[in-house]
From Swiss-Prot:
Name the record gives this protein: Orotate phosphoribosyltransferase
Organism of origin: Acinetobacter baumannii (strain ACICU)
GO biological process: 'de novo' pyrimidine nucleobase biosynthetic process; 'de novo' UMP biosynthetic process; pyrimidine ribonucleoside biosynthetic process
InterPro entries to which the protein is assigned, alphabetical: OPRT (IPR023031), Or_phspho_trans_dom (IPR004467), PRibTrfase_dom (IPR000836), PRTase-like (IPR029057)
Primary role: Catalyzes the transfer of a ribosyl phosphate group from 5-phosphoribose 1-diphosphate to orotate, leading to the formation of orotidine monophosphate (OMP).
Gene3D superfamilies registered for this protein in UniProt: 3.40.50.2020
Keywords noted in UniProt: Glycosyltransferase, Magnesium, Pyrimidine biosynthesis, Transferase
E.C. code: 2.4.2.10
Pathway linked to the protein: Pyrimidine metabolism; UMP biosynthesis via de novo pathway; UMP from orotate: step 1/2
Length: 216
C-alpha cells in the first residue's frame, strides 16, 4: 500500500482541475454573482481524490489544538470525515473518533440525529468542503452544542476570500459570531498563484477583477 504524501495546494489544485472539481470560466453563483471559477467538492468521488483531500485535512488537524472528535455534516461531509480519520491513523499515528449527523432523526435503533463517536463533553472539529453563506455550519454547530459538545473549530477545503452581504467573508462572519477558528486547505489566493505560475493570463485577470470587486 502506498502511503499518501503530505498535502500540497498545487497538487490538489491540479487534481481538482483534472476531475472537474475546479473550473475556470464564467459561473453564476446562488448569490447572483458571476464568478470566474467554480468549485464542487462532490466530484472528489474516487479513491485518489478523496485520499488527497483527507490527507490535507489530517495534516492541518495535527497543527490544531483540542481535537477530541472530528465531525462531518450530512451529507457531503460524511465521506470527508471518515477518510480523514483513516489518514490521521495511517500517516500521523493518531486514532481520532469521528461522527456525523443525519438529516432526519431516527426513532428506532440508535435513534437521534447523531451517529458515531459520542460528542458530549468533547472538543469537536467540523470538516466540510466550503462555507458559502454559513447557514449549514451554524445548523450543525447548534446540533453539536445541544448534544453537549464544545466546537473547537472548522476545517474547509476552500476559502473563497470574498465578502458576504457585508464587509466580512462568510468564514469571517462564522469566526466572529461563533468565536471559533476556521481553517482552509486552499484559498482564492492559492488559485491565483497557480494561474500566475502557469502563465494563464486571461483567467488570472478575471480572478483579479473579481477579487477587486468582492474580495476581502
Amino acid at each position: 500500500m502506498t502511503t499518501p504524501v503530505s498535502f500540497h495546494p498545487q497538487a490538489f489544485i491540479e487534481l481538482a482541475l483534472s476531475r472537474g472539481v475546479l473550473k475556470f470560466g464564467e459561473f453564476t453563483l446562488k448569490s447572483g454573482r458571476v464568478s470566474p471559477y467554480f468549485f464542487n467538492a462532490g466530484l472528489l468521488n474516487d479513491g485518489e481524490a478523496l485520499s488527497l483531500l483527507a490527507q490535507g485535512y489530517a495534516d492541518k488537524l495535527t497543527q490544531c489544538e483540542n481535537v477530541d472528535v472530528i465531525f462531518g455534516p450530512a451529507y457531503k461531509g460524511i465521506p470527508f470525515v471518515a477518510a480523514t480519520a483513516v489518514a490521521l491513523s495511517q500517516t500521523h499515528n493518531k486514532s481520532v473518533p469521528w461522527g456525523f449527523n443525519r438529516k432526519e432523526a431516527k426513532d428506532h435503533g440508535e435513534g437521534g440525529v447523531l451517529v458515531g463517536a459520542a460528542v458530549e463533553g468533547k472538543k469537536v472539529w467540523i470538516i466540510d468542503d466550503v462555507i458559502t453563506a454559513g447557514t449549514a455550519i451554524r445548523e450543525v454547530v447548534t446540533i453539536l452544542k445541544n448534544a453537549g459538545a464544545t466546537i473547537a473549530g472548522v476545517l474547509v477545503a476552500l476559502d473563497r476570500q470574498e465578502r458576504g452581504q457585508g464587509e466580512l467573508s462568510a468564514i469571517q462572519e462564522v469566526q466572529k459570531e461563533l468565536e471559533i477558528p476556521v481553517h482552509a486547505l486552499i484559498t482564492m489566493k492559492d488559485l491565483m498563484d497557480y494561474l500566475e505560475a502557469k502563465g494563464e493570463k486571461e483567467a488570472l485577470a478575471n480572478m483579479q477583477a473579481y477579487r477587486e470587486k468582492y474580495g476581502i
